[in-house]
């Protein structure tokens, strides 16, 4: 069984020479076949996902380590889910500030799901979301980290992802792209207040990471020029990233970026 962790460490420290770590996203193909009850082809039939990676001699980008981060909320924030129909689920968060809901729809061809209704649709919803994020904290769970390590072992180095920066999180987590763009234009003062709360929330997340055993830390944003023009990038994403970079770094941790570009990265 090959130790990919050592090569992973050597690469991020610039000590690997010309060696390359192969990390294909085979897990997506594996999960789709599992969802559809389609056996793996020979000679991989019956293998677990870990066994498949080992048989191919490749490493996994182990996103599972994000489960080692536990969200902490006060008792006056209550969450529950309820079925809407066979394919849809309603998610509810009740707070002293009010209640917000979201609806997600499952895919018919894989384990994925997507928002059909976003958490925040107007300023009243946004005030509830601000209350939620202002009162959240984070805790590293060594127990959950060890569970993931038992699954993947030395197949790859565990990494953790910072939350998306303010405007990116607005698009991906809270309002969706269309709702987020309208909110930036229609209620800029409320959005600015929300972003201050969100940044403080993210700082608590980052401070939690600094005290954890994670060595490899991703800045965790996707940059899509179609929804993030230079004006918004320069106003929100760049200052937020610079702020994160100014937080104290530690010699036992390495930081890296990952971006999906919707345009020529040289532009």
Could you tell me what each predicted segment is?
Residues 62, 78-80, 114-118:
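Short secondary-structure junctions
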Residues 87-95:
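Generic recognition of long tandem-repeat/solenoid scaffolds
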Residues 31-77:
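Segments that shape or occlude catalytic/ligand-binding pockets
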Residues 76-80, 95-96:
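Long, low-complexity intrinsically disordered regulatory regions enriched in P/S/T/G and acidic residues
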Residues 82-85:
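Short loop/turn motifs at secondary-structure junctions and domain boundaries
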Residues 101-115:
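Extended Gly/Ser/Thr-rich low-complexity repeat segments
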Residues 1-39, 94, 100-103, 121-267:
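Active-site loop segments of alpha/beta catalytic cores
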């Amino acid at each position: 069984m090959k130790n990919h962790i050592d090569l992973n460490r050597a690469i991020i420290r610039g000590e690997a020479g010309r060696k390359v770590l192969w990390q294909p996203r085979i897990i997506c193909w594996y999960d789709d076949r599992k969802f559809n009850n389609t056996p793996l082809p020979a000679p991989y039939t019956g293998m677990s996902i870990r066994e498949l990676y080992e048989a191919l001699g490749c490493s996994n980008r182990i996103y599972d380590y994000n489960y080692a981060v536990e969200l902490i909320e006060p008792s006056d924030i209550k969450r529950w889910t309820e079925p809407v129909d066979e394919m849809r689920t309603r998610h509810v968060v009740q707070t002293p500030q009010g209640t917000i809901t979201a609806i997600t729809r499952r895919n018919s061809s894989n384990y994925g799901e997507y928002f059909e209704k976003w958490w925040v649709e107007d300023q009243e919803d946004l005030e509830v979301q601000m209350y939620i994020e202002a009162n959240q904290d984070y805790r590293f769970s060594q127990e959950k980290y060890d569970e993931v390590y038992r699954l993947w072992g030395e197949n790859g180095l565990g990494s953790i992802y910072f939350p998306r920066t303010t405007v990116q999180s607005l698009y991906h987590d809270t309002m969706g792209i269309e709702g987020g763009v309208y909110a930036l234009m229609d209620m800029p003062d409320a959005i600015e207040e929300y972003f201050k709360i969100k940044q403080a929330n993210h700082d608590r997340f980052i401070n939690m990471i600094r005290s954890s055993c994670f060595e490899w830390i991703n800045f965790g944003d996707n940059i899509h020029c179609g929804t993030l023009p230079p004006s918004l990038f320069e106003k929100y994403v760049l200052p937020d990233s610079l702020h994160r970079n100014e937080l104290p770094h530690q010699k036992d941790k390495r930081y890296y970026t990952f971006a999906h570009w919707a345009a020529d990265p040289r532009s």
